[in-house]
Amino acid sequence: MERYNLKAEVRKDTGKGVARKLRRNGLIPGVIYGKTRKPQPLAVDAKDLNKVVGGNAILDMTLVDGDKEEKETAVVKDLQRDPVQGNILHVDFQHISMTDKLTVSVPVHIVGNARGVVAGGVLQQLAREIEVECLPTDIPDEIEVDITDLGLGDSLSVGDIEPPANTDFITPEDEVIVTIVAPSEAVEEEVPAEDEEIMPEPEVIGEEDEGDEEEPEE
C-alpha cells in the first residue's frame, strides 16, 4: 500500500463560481469528511492530486488554514471527472483512523488464458472492482483473478475466489466477475430483417432543449 503526503487549503467560500475560479488557478475543489468529522471544503493543487490518485493510497494530509496547519490521515473516496476531457473536477477525501476498518473498492486484475477462450470463446468481464473491508494498512493494490481453468460457458463469481490476507469481501458472493461465452452470444446488437420496416421515432412536440451539464455541487 502506497502512502503519500498531500497539502490542501481550507476554503470558506463555496459554489460553482468559486469552483470554476479555483480550476482556472490550477486548484481542484474538494471536501474531507468522516464518521467523527464534519465536512470541510478544501482546495488541492491539481498537479499534486494527480500524482496520488489512481489507487487506494493512504494520504497524510496537511490542511492549511491561514497560519494554522492540521494533520489528518485520509483516502480518496470519490472523484468527479469531466466526461469529455477526463480532468478531475472535484475530489472527496474520507478521514480515516489507522486502527479502524474501512470499506474500499479494489481493482480486479485478470490473469491466465482461459481454456474457453483458447477454444474460440469470448471473455466478458462484468466486474472490474470488488469492495473489501480491512484496516488501512491491509488495503490491497489489486485482486488477482486466475481464469485459466474456465471453459466455454463457465463463469467465475466473487464467492469463487479467496479474499486477500486480512480482508473480507463486501461485494455479494453471487456477483459474477467474468464469464466465457460463445462468439454468437457476445454479439449484442440485433440486425433487423430485410423485410422489416423500421419506423422513425415520433417527434416530441414542445420538449425543451437540454441545457449544459451541471457541474458538481461544491
From Swiss-Prot:
GO terms for biological process: translation. The keyword Mitochondrion does not apply. InterPro entries: Rbsml_bL25/Gln-tRNA_synth_N (IPR020056), Ribosomal_bL25/Gln-tRNA_synth (IPR011035), Ribosomal_bL25_b-dom (IPR020057), Ribosomal_bL25_C (IPR037121), Ribosomal_bL25_long (IPR001021), Ribosomal_L25_dom (IPR029751), Ribosomal_uL5_bac-type (IPR020930). GO terms for cellular component: cytosolic large ribosomal subunit. The keyword rRNA-binding applies. Disulfide bonds: none annotated. Keywords: Ribonucleoprotein, Ribosomal protein, RNA-binding, rRNA-binding. Belongs to the bacterial ribosomal protein bL25 family. CTC subfamily. Part of the 50S ribosomal subunit; part of the 5S rRNA/L5/L18/L25 subcomplex. Contacts the 5S rRNA. Binds to the 5S rRNA independently of L5 and L18. This is Large ribosomal subunit protein bL25. The gene is rplY.
